């Protein structure tokens, strides 16, 4: 008799995706981040659901409802901090996952890569609207500053901003709709993630060498299920260390002050995972130019397959490209640091140089370096 997991209509799908899936025999720990992102998403949806049971999306009570969750709800504090720090873990995994894709040339799977970029945008949107919900000072002013950027769009900008706000400023209507968006978006992310997996399983996984691995496949279970479980344990360990020992390490103290439209905080800045994009936005003195640079900094990922000039897929055997990749990582870390600094000398010029370098490496240096490597190998 054939095993039920291979015949049952639903179990067959699960089987082909997580059990009998043929996987390359040499994929490293950099391939763990996909499953970790899945775990992060499930964790965020569950903790978010329990928070939503006690949260009220009204300007008068939002801040105190979050305080109530932390003080009066059973284990409310741990649920709240798991959700807040879970977002940070989500973005750490996302950046590692995207970095892996860039390093090993996974972007040549066009459909998978493009859905991935859409997923990145959706997760960033979810995190942004979620940050507004506690209705602290940084929530309010972050929402005001970022939504205001849309007013840079010619002709329709002002109308668009007021339409999103639901009035003439960030107020009750804005908070209510942001809560609605924050609730629905994770389920859209889950659906997109399934499409992402669907496209991936059409082609099979890439591997560190970038060479087709059809001749050497192993079943996903038990080899990679056990490897994923180790990754999950390390993720949960790191998350719980943050939650239990330094829950506010990555947050902003200003968000413990209730939102006050009459008092602007001295330094308005987003959460750490948006700082690199915020630094690029601030490095251009023109409003529309800054917005375009901000969007381009993420949208540039869609161009990666077009900018790939190397005859090899992966960077594994391309030392010059490897150097450039790690310079790009250092540049992004520099931008992250600059995004959290005040707008004054020398941070302005450092931010501008780092922003120019970011686009220059991706658009100019990487394609040229790949061509040089091809010539050195006489290809």
Curated annotation (Swiss-Prot):
CDD domains attached to this UniProt entry: cytochrome_b_C (cd00290), Cytochrome_b_N (cd00284)
Entry binding sites for heme b b562: 83, 182
PROSITE patterns tied to this protein: CYTB_CTER, CYTB_NTER
Residues at which a ubiquinone binds: 201
UniProt subcellular location: Mitochondrion inner membrane
GO biological process: mitochondrial electron transport, ubiquinol to cytochrome c
A Pfam entry, by short name: Cytochrome_B
GO CC annotations on file: mitochondrial inner membrane; respiratory chain complex III
Keywords: Electron transport, Heme, Iron, Membrane, Metal-binding, Mitochondrion, Mitochondrion inner membrane, Respiratory chain, Transmembrane, Transmembrane helix, Transport, Ubiquinone
Cofactor info, note text: Binds 2 heme b groups non-covalently.
InterPro entries associated with the record: Cyt_b/b6_C, Cyt_b/b6_C_sf, Cyt_b/b6_N, Cytb/b6-like_sf, Cytochrome_b, Cytochrome_b_C_euk/bac, Cytochrome_b_N_euk/bac, Di-haem_cyt_TM
Sequence intervals crossing the membrane: 33-53, 77-98, 113-133, 178-198, 226-246, 288-308, 320-340, 347-367
Gene Ontology MF terms: metal ion binding; ubiquinol-cytochrome-c reductase activity
Residues noted as binding heme b b566 in the record, renumbered to the chain: 97, 196
Record's bilayer topology term: Multi-pass membrane protein
Needed co-factor(s): heme b
Coiled coil: none
Subunit and partners: The cytochrome bc1 complex contains 11 subunits: 3 respiratory subunits (MT-CYB, CYC1 and UQCRFS1), 2 core proteins (UQCRC1 and UQCRC2) and 6 low-molecular weight proteins (UQCRH/QCR6, UQCRB/QCR7, UQCRQ/QCR8, UQCR10/QCR9, UQCR11/QCR10 and a cleavage product of UQCRFS1). This cytochrome bc1 complex then forms a dimer.
Misc note: Heme 1 (or BL or b562) is low-potential and absorbs at about 562 nm, and heme 2 (or BH or b566) is high-potential and absorbs at about 566 nm.
Record family assignment: Belongs to the cytochrome b family.
Function comment: Component of the ubiquinol-cytochrome c reductase complex (complex III or cytochrome b-c1 complex) that is part of the mitochondrial respiratory chain. The b-c1 complex mediates electron transfer from ubiquinol to cytochrome c. Contributes to the generation of a proton gradient across the mitochondrial membrane that is then used for ATP synthesis.
Name recorded for this polypeptide: Cytochrome b
The organism of origin for this protein: Cervus nippon
Name of the gene: MT-CYB
């Amino acid at each position: 008799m054939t095993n039920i997991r291979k015949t049952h209509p639903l179990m067959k799908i699960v089987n082909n995706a997580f059990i009998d899936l043929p996987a390359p025999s040499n994929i490293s720990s950099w391939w763990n981040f996909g499953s970790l992102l899945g775990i992060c998403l499930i964790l965020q949806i569950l903790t978010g659901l329990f928070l939503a049971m006690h949260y009220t999306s009204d300007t008068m009570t939002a801040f105190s409802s979050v305080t109530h969750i932390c003080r009066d709800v059973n284990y409310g504090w741990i649920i709240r901090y798991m959700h807040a720090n879970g977002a940070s873990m989500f973005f750490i995994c996302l950046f590692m996952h995207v970095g892996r894709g860039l390093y090993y040339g996974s972007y040549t799977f066009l459909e998978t890569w493009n859905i991935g970029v859409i997923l990145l945008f959706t997760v960033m949107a979810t995190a942004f609207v979620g940050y507004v919900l506690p209705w602290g000072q940084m929530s309010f002013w972050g929402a005001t500053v970022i939504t205001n950027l849309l007013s840079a769009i010619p002709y329709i900008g002002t109308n668009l901003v007021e339409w999103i706000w639901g009035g003439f400023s960030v107020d009750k209507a804005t908070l209510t709709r942001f809560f609605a968006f924050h609730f629905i978006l994770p389920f859209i992310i889950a659906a997109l993630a399934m499409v992402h997996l669907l496209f991936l399983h059409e082609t099979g996984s890439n591997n560190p060498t970038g060479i087709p691995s059809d001749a050497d496949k192993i079943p996903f279970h038990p080899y990679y299920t056990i490897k994923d479980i180790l990754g999950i344990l390390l993720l949960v360990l790191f998350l719980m260390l943050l939650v239990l020992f330094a829950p506010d390490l990555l947050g902003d103290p200003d968000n413990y002050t209730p939102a006050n439209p009459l008092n602007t905080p001295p330094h308005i800045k987003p959460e750490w995972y948006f700082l690199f994009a915020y630094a690029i936005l601030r490095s251009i003195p023109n409003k529309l130019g800054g917005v375009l640079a901000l969007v381009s900094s993420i949208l540039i990922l869609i161009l990666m397959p077009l900018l790939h000039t190397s005859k090899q897929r992966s960077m594994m055997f391309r030392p010059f490209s490897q150097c450039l990749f790690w310079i790009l990582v250092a540049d992004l870390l520099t931008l992250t640091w600059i995004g959290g600094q005040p707008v004054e000398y020398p941070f302005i010029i450092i931010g501008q140089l780092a922003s120019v370098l970011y686009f220059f490496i991706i658009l100019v240096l990487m394609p040229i370096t790949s061509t040089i490597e091809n010539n050195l190998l006489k290809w």
